[in-house]
């Protein structure tokens, strides 16, 4: 009888192919679940929305009934208390937010990075609020004390001198505060302590899993492994970049477990050329969002 010899390396490669096939099947099933999310009552992904969102009209009988009641109440109110579109400061702000939302949808359809889009949107919103809703510093220290006029002129004249003295001392305190900066600077010590504790917590959790490899979706519909060591970055630089990911600072302040795979993917997608070549950006965005949602619900 002839004997058939099998090379052990062939067995190992076959087992590796089986493992890759199982992981690919899991990834395909997950993608199928994501594509059928609208059938399960899960919110639809932003990428599936049409470009012209204004054409969408979702009808709800109860909502229309409530709207009719609200309209009737508005007609019954006095017209003097009604704010037109020009007088209401929230109307242009809502228009600005709608424009930012449309811009985000267009950029995500072009395949641009999520965190880059989000950071630009946050900067636009913050700059708009700072320009249109800013409160002068002098109003924070405005003297709201009232002075009642007494019937006796002698008491009024006698109290005028100390009132002037108190007013001058109060103005001196206001000037000293204005010279030293806004009132928020009094909180710098506590803010610095909070920032140091947050950075320490983030650095601690990253250092514990610095060499641990995490799975990421590849462009070839498979997966590949990556860890923090392959970033070739200092721990301080990684922590600085990770703090830009939404929700990480809040979780670190609360002492929660951080989404390390999401953090690694966010930093690597902007600082590692090899990672950018290997990873599938669309699937990476979904994986990172799933990790954030999962850890924030704990």
UniProtKB/Swiss-Prot annotation:
Q: Where is the composition biased (Polar residues)?
A: 148-162, 169-178
One Gene Ontology term of the biological-process aspect is: symbiont-mediated suppression of host type I interferon-mediated signaling pathway
Q: According to its UniProt record, how is this protein modified after translation? A: Phosphorylated by host PKC and by an unknown kinase.
Show where the record puts the motif Nuclear localization signal: 212-215
* Residues found modified as Phosphoserine: 64, 211, 272
Instruction: Give an example GO molecular function.
Output: RNA-directed RNA polymerase activity
Q: Where is this motif: Nuclear export signal?
A: 49-58
Q: Which Pfam families match?
A: PP_M1
Q: What subunit structure does UniProt give?
A: Homotrimer when phosphorylated. This trimer is stabilized by binding to the L protein. Binds soluble protein N, and ribonucleocapsid. Interacts with host STAT1, STAT2, DYNLL1, DYNLL2 and PML. Isoform P3 binds host PML.
Under which name does UniProt file this protein?
Phosphoprotein
Provide the species name.
Duvenhage virus (DUVV)
The gene is P
